[in-house]
């Protein structure tokens, strides 16, 4: 079937191409903490290549830089700083129970 004879013509949606997360001038290095921290989740896990939208080579360099920074203790291995909110404590009710002997 010819394109001009289609019953339901497809509407052309415009899209904006996203900027790459790593610019050409950025060096992927274990000391570049501002760059590395963009590729780590809140728990401290390395985000996947699909989430990061980087090439395979860039992902390998990021992974090795993160691991190197972890070993040199520039980054934590896990980020599990749970912030507990203390609610007001309720007073304990003591019952006057006696044990049977």
UniProtKB/Swiss-Prot annotation:
Gene Ontology CC: chloroplast; mitochondrial small ribosomal subunit
Location of this chain's protein in the cell: Plastid, Chloroplast
Pfam families, sorted: Ribosomal_S18
Broad class of the protein's primary localization: plastid
GO biological process: translation
Entry's Gene Ontology molecular function annotations: small ribosomal subunit rRNA binding; structural constituent of ribosome
Record keywords: Chloroplast, Plastid, Ribonucleoprotein, Ribosomal protein, RNA-binding, rRNA-binding
InterPro entries referenced in this protein's UniProt entry, alphabetically: Ribosomal_bS18, Ribosomal_bS18_CS, Ribosomal_bS18_sf
Keyword Ribosomal protein included in the entry's annotation: yes
NCBIfam families given in the database record: S18 (TIGR00165)
PANTHER family: 30S RIBOSOMAL PROTEIN S18, SMALL RIBOSOMAL SUBUNIT PROTEIN BS18M
Quaternary structure, from the entry: Part of the 30S ribosomal subunit.
Family: Belongs to the bacterial ribosomal protein bS18 family.
Name recorded for this polypeptide: Small ribosomal subunit protein bS18c
Annotated organism of origin: Aethionema grandiflorum (Persian stone-cress)
Encoding gene, per UniProt annotation: rps18
């Amino acid at each position: 079937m010819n394109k001009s004879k289609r019953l339901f013509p497809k509407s052309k949606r415009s899209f904006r191409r996203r900027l790459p997360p790593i610019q050409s001038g950025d060096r992927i290095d274990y000391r570049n903490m501002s760059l590395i921290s963009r590729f780590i989740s809140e728990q401290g896990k390395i985000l996947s290549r699909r989430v990061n939208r980087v090439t395979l080579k860039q992902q390998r360099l990021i992974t090795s830089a993160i691991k190197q920074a972890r070993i040199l203790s520039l980054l934590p291995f896990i980020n599990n700083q749970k912030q507990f909110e203390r609610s007001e404590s309720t007073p304990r009710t003591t019952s006057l129970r006696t044990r049977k002997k």
